[in-house]
């Protein structure tokens, strides 16, 4: 969706690494967008498109299945300014789960969420640095590194602390359930 948004705004995405630094280019000249332009495009995308993001293929069905085994909470670094847009978007996509907006690394937030929690916990994220943050702050949490974005996968660093690295939503569900059965 971000690449489509950039195209509508006469830019394109040219990833050469995991980060967006220098990855947004002017479509006509191939020049790297200025930092201000890149920032404006990212924020424009967030403000205009959060409420209409599509679901990753298989995500609603997988979460529905996982809901039979666990309480699902979505911890997202979606900005507070579009929190309600994201809640509405997720509800429209049949993923009506509690959403907590976070800023920065997710390890401390997960630690706070789990403060009085005794059952097995899982953390699933596509960002390897968030997985590492949660792993370092919450050693008992099973950390899952998972992305369905083929555009980013070639540049994705290995996630420190990830004990599960599924290849699809179906694989994630299978490994999650297997992990719970092994725990009994």
Feature-to-residue mapping (PLM):
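Active-site neighborhood of HAD-like aspartate-dependent phosphohydrolases
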Residues: 1-41
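Short, acidic loop-to-helix structural element flanking the phosphoryl-transfer center
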Residues: 32-36, 43-73, 80-87, 108-111
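Residues at the starts of beta-strands that form the adenosine-phosphate
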Residues: 71-72, 120, 142
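Substrate-recognition "cap/lid" segment bordering the active-site pocket of phosphatases
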Residues: 79-122, 128-137
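Short acidic-hydrophobic, aromatic-tinged amphipathic segments that line or gate anion-handling sites
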Residues: 98-104, 161-175
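Short, charged, surface-exposed secondary-structure boundary motifs
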Residues: 107-112, 152-160, 175-177
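Short amphipathic alpha-helix with an adjacent loop that forms part of the alpha/beta core around
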Residues: 110-116, 170-183
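Acidic, Mg2+-coordinating phosphoryl-transfer loop and its flanking beta/alpha structural elements
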Residues: 123-165
């Amino acid at each position: 969706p971000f690449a489509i948004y950039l195209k509508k705004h006469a830019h394109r995405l040219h990833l050469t690494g995991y980060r967006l630094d220098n990855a947004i280019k002017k479509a006509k000249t191939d020049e790297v967008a200025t930092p201000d332009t890149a920032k404006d495009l990212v924020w424009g995308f967030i403000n205009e498109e959060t409420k209409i993001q599509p679901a990753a293929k298989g995500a609603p069905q997988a979460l529905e299945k996982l809901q039979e085994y666990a309480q699902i909470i979505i911890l997202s670094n979606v900005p507070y300014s579009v929190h309600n847009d994201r809640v509405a978007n997720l509800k429209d996509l049949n993923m009506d789960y509690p959403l907590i907006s976070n800023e920065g690394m997710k390890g401390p937030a997960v630690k706070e969420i789990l403060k009085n929690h005794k059952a097995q916990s899982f953390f699933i994220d596509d960002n390897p640095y968030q997985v590492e943050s949660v792993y370092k702050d919450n050693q008992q949490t099973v950390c899952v590194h998972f992305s369905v974005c083929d555009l980013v996968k070639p540049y994705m660093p290995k996630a420190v602390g990830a004990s599960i690295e599924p290849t699809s939503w179906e694989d994630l569900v299978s490994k999650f359930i297997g992990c719970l059965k092994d725990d009994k």
